């Protein structure tokens, strides 16, 4: 079973913009390694002859007809927005330049 390193967890944390302590990096490395082991065990299950399914129940859902309903105009939607520019909602920047 491949071992997940502390550096790999640190790299993933950076990509996810998470600030993790050294203790958390070590803890998560062990937990992710355990998860990979469990997934590996599931992959090794003999499923020969088992019919693939997306849900354990065979209940079929019924779809409703598409109905056109009145919605807000763009002006109505933007009317109560705290900040609008060029007909769009303005939101605070969360990513730095070049990220």
From Swiss-Prot:
Its EC number is 6.3.5.-. GO terms for biological process: glutaminyl-tRNAGln biosynthesis via transamidation; regulation of translational fidelity; translation. SUPFAM superfamilies: Glu-tRNAGln amidotransferase C subunit (SSF141000). The keyword S-adenosyl-L-methionine does not apply. It is an enzyme of class 6 (ligase). GO terms for molecular function: asparaginyl-tRNA synthase (glutamine-hydrolyzing) activity; ATP binding; glutaminyl-tRNA synthase (glutamine-hydrolyzing) activity. It catalyses: L-glutamyl-tRNA(Gln) + L-glutamine + ATP + H2O = L-glutaminyl-tRNA(Gln) + L-glutamate + ADP + phosphate + H(+); L-aspartyl-tRNA(Asn) + L-glutamine + ATP + H2O = L-asparaginyl-tRNA(Asn) + L-glutamate + ADP + phosphate + 2 H(+). InterPro entries: Asp/Glu-ADT_sf_sub_c (IPR036113), GatC (IPR003837). Keywords: ATP-binding, Ligase, Nucleotide-binding, Protein biosynthesis. It comes from the Bacteria. Heterotrimer of A, B and C subunits. Allows the formation of correctly charged Asn-tRNA(Asn) or Gln-tRNA(Gln) through the transamidation of misacylated Asp-tRNA(Asn) or Glu-tRNA(Gln) in organisms which lack either or both of asparaginyl-tRNA or glutaminyl-tRNA synthetases. The reaction takes place in the presence of glutamine and ATP through an activated phospho-Asp-tRNA(Asn) or phospho-Glu-tRNA(Gln). NCBIfam families: gatC. Belongs to the GatC family. This is Aspartyl/glutamyl-tRNA(Asn/Gln) amidotransferase subunit C. It comes from Corynebacterium efficiens (strain DSM 44549 / YS-314 / AJ 12310 / JCM 11189 / NBRC 100395). The lineage of its organism: Bacteria, Bacillati, Actinomycetota, Actinomycetes, Mycobacteriales.
């Amino acid at each position: 079973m491949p071992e997940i390193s502390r550096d790999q967890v640190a790299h993933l944390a950076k990509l996810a913009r998470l600030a993790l302590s050294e203790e958390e990096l070590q803890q998560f490395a062990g937990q992710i390694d355990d998860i990979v082991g469990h997934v590996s065990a599931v992959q090794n299950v003999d499923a020969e002859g088992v019919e693939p399914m997306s849900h354990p129940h065979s209940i079929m859902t019924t779809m409703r007809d598409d109905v056109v309903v009145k919605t807000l105009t763009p002006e109505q939607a933007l009317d109560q927005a705290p900040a609008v520019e060029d007909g769009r909602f303005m939101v605070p920047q969360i990513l730095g330049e070049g990220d």
